[in-house]
Design a protein with these regions (language model features):
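Residues in the short beta-alpha loop(s) of Rossmann-like NAD(P)-binding domains
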Residues: 10, 81-83, 138
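Acidic, glycine-centered active-site loop in nucleotide-sugar glycosyltransferases
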Residues: 129, 146-156
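A donor-sugar binding/catalytic signature common to diverse glycosyltransferases
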Residues: 102-145
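Active-site-proximal region of nucleotide-activated glycan assembly enzymes
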Residues: 1-30
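Hydrophobic/aromatic beta-strand patches that form the interior of the parallel beta-sheet core
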Residues: 3-5, 29-31, 78, 93-95, ...
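Donor-nucleotide binding loops and adjacent catalytic segments primarily
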Residues: 32-112, 162
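Leloir-type glycosyltransferase catalytic cores
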Residues: 155-183
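Short glycine-/small-residue-rich Rossmann-like dinucleotide-binding loops
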Residues: 9, 53, 118
Length: 183
């Protein structure tokens, strides 16, 4: 390679922790996070945005578990990223896949977000300065590491996709601490 571009900050705290650590090299340069999602001025809605991603069958199990737990709290839920029909109710609105401008609007207007801890999603959260309940896909070691790192470094709430519970949601929904926008 003639050039290595690293989508992270050179200085700490890095978004990717040890994953972007490199030995000094003239070829490597830190270019900051990459995100299609930008902060926009929009009224904040009290709703839980669930962004589904990852392989099946984990994706469908994740959707089912989150909806079952969150509905118990009486919180409006919007689900994106699911191709299969989801149970609709007064509180659940399933949108399927969203384009980037739709997702940008939803992420900016939602008071709460639940998502996987993939690096692209984390860069989007950093770009808009939003906290989320991070639930790594089991067996995806990068996601597991990043969820743990963001929990420790940026005080993000995390949960395990096999053990997500109403208690996790209540703790997250009551978390009023801020996350500084980083771009």
């Amino acid at each position: 390679f003639n050039k290595i571009e690293i989508p992270d900050f050179e200085n700490t705290p890095k978004l990717s922790g040890k994953l972007s650590s490199v030995k000094a090299s003239a070829k490597a340069s830190f270019i900051g996070p990459l995100s299609q999602i930008k902060p926009i001025q929009t009224p904040l809605k009290k709703q839980l945005l669930v962004i589904l991603s990852g392989p099946e069958p984990q994706r469908s199990r994740f959707a089912k578990d989150i909806i079952e737990e969150a509905v118990q709290l009486g919180f409006p839920i919007i689900v994106t990223g699911e191709s299969k029909p989801l149970p609709h109710s007064k509180l659940v609105k399933a949108l399927g896949y969203c384009n980037s401008s739709e997702l940008e609007q939803l992420m900016n207007e939602s008071s709460h977000i639940v998502c996987r801890s993939g690096y692209s999603t984390l860069m989007e959260l950093a770009a808009i300065g939003k906290k989320a309940l991070l639930v790594p896909t089991s067996g995806q070691f990068e996601q597991e590491y990043l969820a743990k790192y963001w929990g420790e470094q940026f005080n993000f709430p995390t949960s395990n996709d096999h053990e997500i519970s109403t208690k996790d949601f209540v703790k997250y929904l009551n978390d009023t601490s801020d996350f500084e926008r980083r771009e």
